């Protein structure tokens, strides 16, 4: 089973109390949600939200205090205006919000093209309505693709990789992860990053972020925190790369300046060596938390 990252730290900063209404905006496999429910008492409510249509069919929690929405967490302010949201929840704002921005080991193994470790259809989409990565490669110009790889992957060979991909597309459209890896590998120099990471790592990250509008989703939910959380409500966000962490840090800082929130984490919280040994995925996790004023 997918191990929830920074579980103790999430509970510490989210601080769910009996009777509260908490939102897990990235339900995933439900690891954080199960622990949150333990703290809510008989009258608390937990709303799970996930864009991945498979999450709730596989990991739905059988508990009258739990309800779920198959939706994008960026739409939470709209979801909460719907009287059905949260089922028995009588308020349209929550006392806590958790966002774990990583993708799970189950998604990596889902056959949807998130991983470059095996050859599978190049989809990279969390649901069936999002345009798949293979179509994105066809639609973007070389210049546009280079911008995606540079800005979302922070890849220094962005131009060479974009050119190699578009050159390959002229011969035969790239349909699988294996074909994309081959194009990338041809573009980067031998000894790429001195072997520290796979040559495809940053390009795959960039395409996944672009296909699913991950940074735009994060910015949208941050803009609407006051519509989502009650005064005193807590938001806990776990990010896994510098682009996400920078957005969270800057929004928290800007909201603090105008007296909208109190930052609870002066520096991002990271995993202990013990947790990293058990769950290597936690190595790059950074947790930031704040309280709405």
Regions of interest found by a model, annotated:
Residues 1-293:
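S-adenosyl-L-methionine-dependent methyltransferase catalytic core, i.e., the SAM/SAH-binding region
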């Amino acid at each position: 089973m997918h191990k929830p990252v920074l579980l103790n730290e999430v509970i510490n900063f989210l601080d769910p109390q009996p009777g509260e209404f908490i939102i897990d905006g990235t339900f995933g496999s439900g690891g954080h949600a199960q622990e949150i429910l333990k703290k809510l008492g008989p009258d608390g409510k937990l709303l799970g939200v996930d864009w991945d249509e498979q999450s709730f069919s596989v990991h739905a929690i059988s508990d009258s205090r739990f309800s779920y929405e198959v939706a994008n967490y960026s739409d939470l302010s709209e979801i909460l205006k719907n009287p059905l949201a949260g089922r028995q929840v009588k308020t349209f704002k929550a006392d806590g919000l958790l966002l774990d921005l990583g993708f799970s080991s189950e998604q990596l193994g889902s056959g949807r093209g998130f991983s470059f470790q095996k050859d599978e259809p190049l989809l990279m989409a969390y649901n069936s309505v999002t345009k798949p990565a293979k179509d994105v490669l066809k639609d973007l110009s070389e210049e546009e693709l280079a911008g995606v790889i540079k800005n979302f992957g922070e890849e220094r060979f962005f131009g060479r990789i974009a050119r190699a991909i578009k050159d390959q597309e002229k011969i035969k459209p790239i349909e699988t992860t294996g074909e994309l890896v081959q194009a990338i590998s041809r573009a980067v120099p031998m000894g790429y990053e001195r072997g520290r990471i796979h040559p495809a790592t940053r390009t795959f990250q960039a395409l996944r972020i672009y296909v699913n509008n991950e940074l735009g989703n994060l910015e949208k939910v941050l803009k609407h925190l006051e519509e989502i959380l009650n005064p005193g409500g807590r938001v806990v966000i776990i990010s896994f790369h510098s682009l996400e962490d920078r957005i969270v840090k800057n929004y928290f800082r800007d909201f603090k300046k105008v007296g909208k929130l109190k930052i609870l984490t002066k520096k991002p919280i990271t995993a202990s060596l013990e947790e990293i040994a058990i769950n290597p995925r936690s190595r790059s996790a950074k947790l930031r938390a704040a309280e709405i004023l």
